[in-house]
C-alpha cells in the first residue's frame, strides 16, 4: 500500500498548520496497521486539532483511533472535526500517559477491540500544539501579551505565574537551565525575584520586558527571541511534560500488539533524549556481554525501526516550518502479550 501524502487537506481546519511529517508518520505506522487488518486501533496521544488523526482515518479506511488530549477545548474541537468518521474515532480527555487505564476502562467498541487485540500503533507529537499557541489567552506565546497561564489542562495544577511568584531562586534557575537551556538562568532568576517583590507577575508582557532587559544585547542579536527559552522552560514545568513522556513509554509499549509500533516526534533535546534512552533499553538484550546467544527470557521484546532520529526533509520544512526541529523515533514490538495499566504500574 502506497501512502504518498496526497489528500484533500484543508489547512484552515487545522488552525493554519499542516501536521508535521504526516505522510512519513503514515508510512511508519502502515506495516502495523496492515498486519492488524480490521482490528487496527491507533492511539493519537497528542490529538491537538486532529490533523494527524484525520490523515490516518482518511489514508487507512479500516483503522480506528483513540485520540487523547488533556485540553478539553482541543478535544471538543478535534472531535467535531472528526465526526464524519463516526464510530471509528473516540476521544479521551486525559494526559497521554493515562491512556492505558482509559483503554482498560473504556466502554465503546474501539476500546473493546484494543483490549482484545492490543494497539496496532501510537503517535505522540510532543510539545505545545498549534491550536494552543493560537489561543492568545492561554499564555503560551511570548509575542502577544496574555495571562501567564500555560496549562495544557486549564483545570489542573499551577500556572506559569505561580512558578514565577513562588519558586526559590535555585528552583527557578534550575528549570530555566534544565528545560530551557538558558545560559543566563541565574541572572534571570535574580531579576524575577527582585521584580516580584514590587508586584507579582500576572501577564506575559512584563516577563518579556524583563528578559529583554536582563539578557545581554549581543546574545539577543544572535540567539533568537530572548523569551523563547524561558517560556519553553515554564511550559515544561507547568505541565510536567518530561515526566509524562517518561511514564507513557512503558504504558504504550506494553499496550502494543506483536508488530505494533510506537512513534514519537520530539522538538527539543530533552524530549528526544528520554525517548532515545527508553527505546535503547527496550530493544537491548539483557544477556551478559560475550555470550554467543541470548539466554532464555533475556531477548529484547522490541526493535527500533528508525535509524537514529529521523529529521524532516527540506521540502517538508519549506511547507511546514515547525518541522525544522522535529526528531522522529519509532519502535516495534516483537513479542509479548498486550497489557493496559496506569503510569508507573503493571496490571
UniProtKB/Swiss-Prot annotation:
Q: Which Pfam family is one of those matched by this entry?
A: Methyltransf_5
Give a GO cellular-component term.
cytoplasm
**What keywords were assigned to this record?**
Cytoplasm, Methyltransferase, rRNA processing, S-adenosyl-L-methionine, Transferase
Q: Which InterPro entries match?
A: RsmH (IPR002903), SAM-dep_MeTrfase_MraW_recog (IPR023397), SAM-dependent_MTases_sf (IPR029063)
- EC class, as a word, reads transferase
SUPFAM superfamilies from the UniProt entry: Putative methyltransferase TM0872, insert domain, S-adenosyl-L-methionine-dependent methyltransferases
Domain of life (superkingdom): Bacteria
Q: Where in the cell is it found?
A: Cytoplasm
Give the Gene Ontology MF terms in alphabetical order. Answer: rRNA (cytosine-N4-)-methyltransferase activity
Catalyzed reactions per annotation: cytidine(1402) in 16S rRNA + S-adenosyl-L-methionine = N(4)-methylcytidine(1402) in 16S rRNA + S-adenosyl-L-homocysteine + H(+)
- Return the EC number: 2.1.1.199
For the biological process aspect of GO, one term held by this record is: rRNA base methylation
Q: Which sites bind S-adenosyl-L-methionine?
A: 50-52, 69, 96, 125, 132
**Which family does the UniProt entry place this protein in?**
Belongs to the methyltransferase superfamily. RsmH family.
Q: What does this protein do?
A: Specifically methylates the N4 position of cytidine in position 1402 (C1402) of 16S rRNA.
Q: What is this protein called?
A: Ribosomal RNA small subunit methyltransferase H
The record's gene field reads rsmH
Amino acid at each position: 500500500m502506497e501512502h504518498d501524502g496526497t489528500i484533500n487537506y484543508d489547512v484552515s481546519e487545522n488552525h493554519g498548520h499542516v501536521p508535521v511529517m504526516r505522510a512519513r508518520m503514515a508510512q511508519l505506522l502502515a506495516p502495523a496497521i496492515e498486519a492488524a487488518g480490521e482490528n487496527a486501533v491507533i492511539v493519537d496521544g497528542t490529538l491537538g486539532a486532529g490533523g494527524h488523526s484525520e490523515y490516518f482515518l482518511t489514508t487507512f479506511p479500516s483503522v480506528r483511533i483513540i485520540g487523547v488530549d488533556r485540553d478539553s477545548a482541543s478535544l471538543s474541537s478535534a472531535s467535531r472535526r472528526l465526526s464524519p468518521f463516526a464510530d471509528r474515532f473516540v476521544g479521551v480527555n486525559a494526559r497521554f500517559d493515562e491512556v492505558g487505564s482509559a483503554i482498560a476502562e473504556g466502554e465503546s467498541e474501539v476500546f473493546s477491540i484494543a483490549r482484545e487485540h492490543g494497539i496496532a500503533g501510537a503517535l505522540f507529537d510532543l510539545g505545545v500544539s498549534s491550536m494552543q499557541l493560537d489561543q492568545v489567552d492561554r499564555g503560551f506565546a511570548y509575542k502577544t501579551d496574555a495571562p501567564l497561564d500555560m496549562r495544557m489542562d486549564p483545570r489542573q495544577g499551577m500556572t506559569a505565574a505561580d512558578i514565577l511568584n513562588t519558586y526559590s531562586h535555585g528552583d527557578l534557575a534550575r528549570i530555566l537551565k534544565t528545560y530551557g537551556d538558558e545560559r543566563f538562568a541565574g541572572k534571570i532568576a535574580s531579576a524575577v525575584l527582585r521584580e516580584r517583590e514590587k508586584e507579582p507577575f500576572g501577564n506575559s508582557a512584563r516577563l518579556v520586558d524583563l528578559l529583554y532587559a536582563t539578557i545581554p544585547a549581543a546574545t539577543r542579536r544572535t540567539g533568537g527571541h530572548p523569551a523563547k527559552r524561558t517560556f519553553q522552560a515554564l511550559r515544561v514545568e507547568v505541565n510536567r511534560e518530561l515526566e509524562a513522556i517518561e511514564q507513557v513509554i512503558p504504558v504504550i509499549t506494553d499496550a502494543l500488539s506483536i508488530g505494533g509500533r510506537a512513534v514519537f516526534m520530539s522538538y527539543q533535546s530533552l524530549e528526544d533524549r528520554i525517548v532515545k534512552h527508553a527505546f535503547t533499553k527496550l530493544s537491548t538484550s539483557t544477556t551478559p556481554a560475550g555470550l554467543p546467544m541470548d539466554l532464555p527470557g533475556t531477548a529484547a521484546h522490541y526493535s527500533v525501526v528508525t535509524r537514529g532520529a529521523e529529521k524532516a526533509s527540506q521540502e517538508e520544512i519549506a511547507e511546514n516550518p515547525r518541522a525544522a526541529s522535529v526528531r522522529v523515533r519509532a519502535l516495534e514490538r516483537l513479542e509479548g502479550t498486550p497489557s493496559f495499566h496506569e503510569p508507573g504500574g503493571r496490571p
